[in-house]
From Swiss-Prot:
Residues given in the record as S-adenosyl-L-methionine binding sites: 158, 179, 201, 244
Signal peptide residue numbers: none
UniProt name for this protein: Ribosomal protein L11 methyltransferase
Function statement: Methylates ribosomal protein L11.
Protein EC: 2.1.1.-
Naturally occurring in which organism (per UniProt): Streptococcus pyogenes serotype M28 (strain MGAS6180)
SS bond list: none
């Protein structure tokens, strides 16, 4: 029977996406996130028992490697990469790395135990697809099976993107989701009343996973998923464009976004660490956008821009 090697990295919450990327790049077959914030404030609504945890800024990122992997080399590389991330200004915290062997059947499902239903915004709750959940009145439930290589929607960058969509969408809009990943932002847009959603990702795996997640949610036939390199070659106009990806990539799409967004439409950009904030602001302002909202959670920033001639209450341009 084949065995797998489980590596757990304890880092600051702000480093979640960057460290997850490091683990995937070193050969992990997927990652899971254990975050105390997912449990804080949870109520035993229908007999569920949630762990008794204290709020902490540290999270555990669990990665799974084939038994043939030279774990000593992998751990050395992980530590080198984390030190480099810290030198760039990303808050990684006091890093510790643990490892253990895991049987095949345990590996297949072990990562799922770290995911619980999570209320993300006033209206939106993300629920793992394998969990039974009874929604309260008015609650909009996003069923998600992210797979081990995609986030579960609880990262600050995703939360802020979802909050922005909830504030902006009123029904009937056309939305473009750039770098859709698990598809969570597209599904949320549909649940919040958008008429048509176009979801693009350069990664073929993401395109497949996004479509699978969309199929888990009823009433999402208005979401169209396709492979795409940012907004290159896109001609469809939109009321809202949302992108939750790395800041260095965000700056490459602002001109195309301005071309595609209708007047009085919105551009939501998330995934921006603080040291990259000015770079993203400059790119959006140069494209012609005005800043309407700036959200911050820890080291992460999300920005809501508007394409408008009415500059009262907005900044930049």
């Amino acid at each position: 029977m084949e065995t797998w090697q489980e590596v757990t990295v304890h880092v600051h919450r702000d480093a979640q996406e960057a460290v997850s990327h490091v683990l995937i790049e070193t050969g992990s077959q997927g990652v899971a996130i254990a975050d105390s914030a997912d449990y804080i404030g949870q109520k035993d609504r229908f007999g569920e028992l949630y762990p008794d945890v204290e709020q902490s800024d540290m999270i555990a990122i669990i990665a799974y490697y084939p038994s043939s992997t030279n774990l000593a080399d992998v751990i050395a590389t992980i530590n080198e990469q984390l030190a480099e991330l810290a030198s760039f200004g990303l808050q990684v915290g006091q890093v510790t790395v643990d490892s253990q062997e895991l049987a095949e059947e345990d590996w297949a499902d072990n990562w799922k135990k770290y995911y619980e239903p999570a209320r993300i915004t006033h209206d939106l709750t993300i629920v793992p697809s394998w969990t039974d959940y009874d929604a309260s009145a008015g609650e909009k439930v996003i069923k998600l099976d992210p797979g081990m290589a995609f986030g579960t929607g609880t990262h600050p960058t995703t939360k802020m993107s979802l909050f922005a969509l909830e504030q902006i969408l009123r029904g009937g809009e056309t939305v473009i989701d750039v770098g859709t990943g698990s598809g969570v932002l597209s599904i949320a847009s549909s649940l919040l009343g958008a008429k048509t959603i176009y979801a693009y990702d350069l990664d073929d795996v993401a395109v497949r996973v996004a479509q699978e997640n969309i199929d888990l949610n009823q009433g999402t036939d208005n979401i169209h998923v396709a492979a795409g390199d940012l907004l290159k070659g896109v001609s469809q106009e939109a009321d809202v464009i949302v992108a939750n990806i790395l800041a260095d990539i965000l700056v490459l799409l602002t001109d195309d976004a301005y071309r595609l967004i209708k007047k009085e439409g919105y551009l939501i950009l998330s995934g921006i660490i603080s040291e990259k904030l000015d770079m993203v602001l400059e790119a959006a302002f140069s494209a012609g956008f005005f800043l309407e909202t700036h959200m911050v959670q820890g080291e992460w920033n999300a920005l809501v821009f508007k394409k408008t001639d009415d500059i009262s209450g907005v900044i930049g341009g």
